[in-house]
């Protein structure tokens, strides 16, 4: 019988087993317990591990195989999305309202379902943002936040966490601008974590976990960018 690892909250060093020990079913479940301290979260991301659990559950840590990733230069922009981008009716910013983005991502969806972003998760990622490790992209209509996404940056790897839209394509527009900026900064890939038809339509693809870990180990130790993040001015002026 396969078992997963229980993490001691009082122990940080060597807290996680190797991702290859993750369960096949449910795919990628590796460990349970611990905490969401910045140190533990950073350690987890560096090893290709992320937390994902629902309210009332213990903290669950995952490293699925295969892994969904997107190479920024292979981003697919549909004809309808391209048309909306060219119209330029929305404004896009970086790191302007991280708390607002994560709160919107945590809000119940239109279908009435809640999300996995608990108050504990919000507090943890807000701390990472204050440290310059977690970042947000915001899409605005006038002064209203209508879409966006947030994630974690370690070295030259961006780990996408969640996105939301209150208007058609608002989160996709945020994602397009993020991809273009990360491409300029030399980020080779975006970790999209688990399979998603929404992201696959934008060009995301699956990689075997061992190949993803190879990319991660090569680029997660690159120098991190200074905080806060900003889009290059010419990127915002030009049509994508």
Swiss-Prot record:
GO molecular function: leucyl-tRNA--protein transferase activity
Cystine crosslinks: none
Keyword Glycoprotein: no
Listed EC numbers: 2.3.2.6
Pfam families, A to Z: Leu_Phe_trans
GO cellular component: cytoplasm
Catalytic reaction list: N-terminal L-lysyl-[protein] + L-leucyl-tRNA(Leu) = N-terminal L-leucyl-L-lysyl-[protein] + tRNA(Leu) + H(+); N-terminal L-arginyl-[protein] + L-leucyl-tRNA(Leu) = N-terminal L-leucyl-L-arginyl-[protein] + tRNA(Leu) + H(+); L-phenylalanyl-tRNA(Phe) + an N-terminal L-alpha-aminoacyl-[protein] = an N-terminal L-phenylalanyl-L-alpha-aminoacyl-[protein] + tRNA(Phe)
Primary residence: cytoplasm
Superkingdom per UniProt: Bacteria
Keyword check for Cytoplasm: yes
Signal sequence extent: none
Keywords of the record: Acyltransferase, Cytoplasm, Transferase
Family per record: Belongs to the L/F-transferase family.
Biological role stated in the UniProt entry: Functions in the N-end rule pathway of protein degradation where it conjugates Leu, Phe and, less efficiently, Met from aminoacyl-tRNAs to the N-termini of proteins containing an N-terminal arginine or lysine.
Protein name (Swiss-Prot/TrEMBL): Leucyl/phenylalanyl-tRNA--protein transferase
The organism's taxonomic lineage, starting at the top: Bacteria, Pseudomonadati, Pseudomonadota, Gammaproteobacteria, Chromatiales
């Amino acid at each position: 019988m396969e078992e997963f690892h229980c993490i001691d909250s009082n122990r940080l060093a060597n807290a996680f087993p190797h991702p290859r020990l993750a369960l096949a079913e449910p795919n990628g479940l590796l460990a349970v317990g611990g905490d969401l301290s910045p140190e533990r979260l950073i350690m987890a991301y560096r090893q290709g591990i992320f937390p994902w659990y629902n309210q009332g559950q213990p903290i669950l840590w995952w490293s699925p195989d295969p892994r969904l990733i997107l190479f920024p230069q292979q981003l697919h922009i549909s004809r309808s999305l391209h048309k909306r981008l060219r119209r330029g009716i929305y404004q896009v910013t970086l790191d302007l309202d991280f708390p607002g983005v994560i709160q919107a991502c945590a809000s119940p969806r239109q279908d009435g379902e809640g999300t996995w972003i608990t108050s504990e998760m919000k507090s943890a990622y807000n701390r990472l943002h204050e440290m310059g490790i977690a970042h947000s992209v915001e899409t605005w209509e006038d002064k209203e936040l209508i879409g966006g996404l947030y994630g974690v940056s370690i070295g030259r790897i961006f780990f996408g966490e969640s996105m939301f839209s209150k208007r058609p394509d608002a989160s996709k527009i945020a994602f397009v601008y993020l991809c273009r900026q990360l491409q300029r900064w030399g980020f080779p890939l975006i970790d999209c974590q688990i399979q998603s038809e929404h992201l696959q339509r934008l060009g995301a693809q699956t990689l075997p976990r061992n190949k993803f870990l190879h990319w991660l180990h090569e680029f997660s130790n690159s120098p991190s960018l200074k905080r806060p993040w900003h889009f290059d001015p010419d990127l915002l002026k030009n049509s994508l």
